[in-house]
């Protein structure tokens, strides 16, 4: 699996240390093991996880501005855990409302010795952002409007929302809550992943 990950990283033009590669493979191993009992992801094949979970997460790392991020609706830690591995200088709060997912995240944190993640069990509307975050990341929300509406209290004044999407649909981007606009739409190229992938960056219009 390490060889396959290395090939995928080469295809994507991403350079990681051997330690980071080993951490990513270990994370896939834990996800595969826990998935059998906890049903954390619909992806059952570890090799497919490398593409659909690992590469699809870390491909956005160069576009994140700041050092404090929150991954809302992180599920089994996606994209937060892979991003924390490839950006050890940044801190990631991993927010999910389901206890079984947060228990898994704490196990990952323990086994991989990740000191730059904080798993939290909470509903997003009940979670206080103190201090606020540089970036709010998610691939869990059905719509951009929902993401901004539910998470508006989380970013700092100069912070951004980062939504990992398949299609970047014009009507969805035009239907943001009042006061917010699209800062950037980045087309992502994930090796061996079929279909379009985009990173939609949202910020307050006052900036």
From Swiss-Prot:
GO MF annotations, alphabetized: rRNA (guanine-N7-)-methyltransferase activity
Reactions accelerated catalytically: guanosine(527) in 16S rRNA + S-adenosyl-L-methionine = N(7)-methylguanosine(527) in 16S rRNA + S-adenosyl-L-homocysteine
Function: Specifically methylates the N7 position of guanine in position 527 of 16S rRNA.
Keywords: Cytoplasm, Methyltransferase, rRNA processing, S-adenosyl-L-methionine, Transferase
Name by which UniProt lists this protein: Ribosomal RNA small subunit methyltransferase G
HAMAP family: 16SrRNA_methyltr_G
InterPro entries (alphabetical): rRNA_ssu_MeTfrase_G (IPR003682), SAM-dependent_MTases_sf (IPR029063)
UniProt main location, coarse: cytoplasm
Organism: Klebsiella pneumoniae (strain 342)
Gene3D superfamilies noted in UniProt: Vaccinia Virus protein VP39
Positions with a binding annotation for S-adenosyl-L-methionine: 73, 78, 124-125, 139
EC numbers for this chain: 2.1.1.170
GO CC annotations on file: cytosol
Family as reported in the entry's similarity comment: Belongs to the methyltransferase superfamily. RNA methyltransferase RsmG family.
């Amino acid at each position: 699996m390490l060889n396959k990950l290395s090939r995928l990283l080469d295809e994507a033009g991403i350079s990681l240390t051997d330690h980071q590669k080993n951490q990513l493979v270990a994370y896939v191993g834990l996800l595969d093991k826990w998935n059998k009992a906890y049903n954390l992801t619909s992806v059952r094949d570890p090799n497919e996880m490398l593409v659909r979970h690992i590469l699809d997460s870390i491909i956005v790392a160069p576009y994140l501005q700041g050092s404090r991020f929150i991954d809302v609706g992180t599920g089994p830690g996606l994209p937060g855990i892979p991003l924390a591995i490839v950006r050890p200088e940044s801190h990631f709060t991993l927010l999910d409302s389901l206890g079984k997912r947060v228990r898994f995240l704490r196990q990952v944190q323990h086994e991989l010795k990740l000191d730059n993640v904080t798993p939290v069990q909470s509903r997003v509307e009940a979670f206080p952002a103190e201090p606020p975050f540089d970036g709010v990341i998610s691939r869990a929300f059905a719509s951009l409007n929902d993401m901004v509406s539910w998470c508006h209290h989380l970013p700092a004044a100069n912070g951004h929302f980062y939504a990992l999407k398949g299609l970047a649909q014009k009507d969805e981007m035009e239907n943001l809550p009042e006061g917010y606009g699209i800062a950037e739409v980045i087309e992502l190229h994930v090796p061996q992943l079929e279909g379009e992938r985009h990173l939609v960056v949202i910020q307050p219009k006052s900036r």
